[in-house]
Amino acid sequence: MAISDLLNRRVRALPEEDEEVYSGESASEAESNDEQIDESRSDDSSDESLEDHGGARSNGSELSDDDEADEDSNISEDSAADDDDESDASEADDMQASLSHISFGALAKAQASLGPHAKRKLKHSKASTAADAADDDDEKAAAAPSPLDDIRARIREAREQKRQGSAPSASKARDAEKPSRSSKHAPMVQSSKHAVSRKRTIIEPPAVLKSRDPRFDPAVRGQGGSRDGGINKAYAFLDEYRANELKELKEKFAKTKDLREKEDLKRAIRATTDRLRTTENRRREKEVLAEHKKREKQLILEGKKSNPYFLKKSELKKQVLVKKYESMGSRQRVKALERRQKKMTAKERKEMPMERRGFENDAAPFNNDGGGRKRRKLA
């Protein structure tokens, strides 16, 4: 019954972290099972030794009693054979009773444990002990591994396989858990392969005319890329519009009698006049620069100069002023010079200290602080 209980015992696998405890328990159980098996084997060996002693005694009695008849020897042999048969029958009954209590799972494990390795061992033992049949049977019985040993070996192999398989499985799980990117802030990897659209343009639609801005049109700007010159030429008509507008504003200012409207018209006339004057001054500066560059290039080509001379801002301003006065008439030039003289005089007077400013009335009131004279406001 001990063998059936051991075979019916089921093995329960524990988690990996409890393997050491489980292995210790299984080792203790295996030691207890080995002790039980050793005890059973010792009992069998004692029985066999007793039988051997009995046979020896019977043989001694036969050798000592030479006068006994052949019938007594036959009877003793028959009795010994009957004893052997009875012992074999009792052992077979015990084995049958124990096997009847073994579960199908234990039988399947025992059958699986008897693999080709065990069969090769049995064949080798049969071939080596073919001389003596009885001794051969005893040696086979002694050399054949017990089902419990095979089950223990099978369990050990399963544990080792489980330990070896758990490491790659854990690594695979870790690899599967790893994200596709190194970090969540890293850019995502996207395949460049995209499905081609099945739509095909058989007939091209007519081209739609797009609006063009003449300021950025290459036809207006010219091939040389001189943007300012092209724009000035393209929008030269605006200067004529501004001149006509100034003329209309002056006529309206002469006809109107409303003071508020006159103030508005006066402000508009001043703004338009300043805009036209600024445009004219810029145009005059460009002309002066163009003439100077042309003159310098000509001198370099003639060999009179090796390096060009670039005008300073003060010299450019003087040449622009000379050109302005040359383009005026005699009366306009006189009036312009008078206005400029007054302007320069006022500017110099402002820069002078109060004590040096010329006043007609020397008895003008001074400040209470004891400083210079007070500045008179012009009406």
From Swiss-Prot:
GO terms for cellular component: 90S preribosome; nucleolus. InterPro entries: RRP36. It is found in: Nucleus, Nucleolus. Residues 149-163, 335-360 have a biased composition (Basic and acidic residues). Keywords: Coiled coil, Nucleus, Ribonucleoprotein, Ribosome biogenesis, rRNA processing. The keyword Secreted does not apply. Residues 117-126 have a biased composition (Basic residues). Pfam families: RRP36 (PF06102). Residues 63-94 have a biased composition (Acidic residues). One of its GO terms (biological process) is maturation of SSU-rRNA from tricistronic rRNA transcript (SSU-rRNA, 5.8S rRNA, LSU-rRNA). It comes from the Eukaryota. Its main location: nucleus. The keyword Ribonucleoprotein applies. Residues 242-300 form a coiled coil. Residues 1-98, 113-231, 329-379 are annotated as: Disordered. Associates with 90S and pre-40S pre-ribosomal particles. Component of the 90S pre-ribosome involved in the maturation of rRNAs. Required for early cleavages of the pre-RNAs in the 40S ribosomal subunit maturation pathway. Belongs to the RRP36 family. PANTHER family: RIBOSOMAL RNA PROCESSING PROTEIN 36 HOMOLOG. This is rRNA biogenesis protein rrp36.
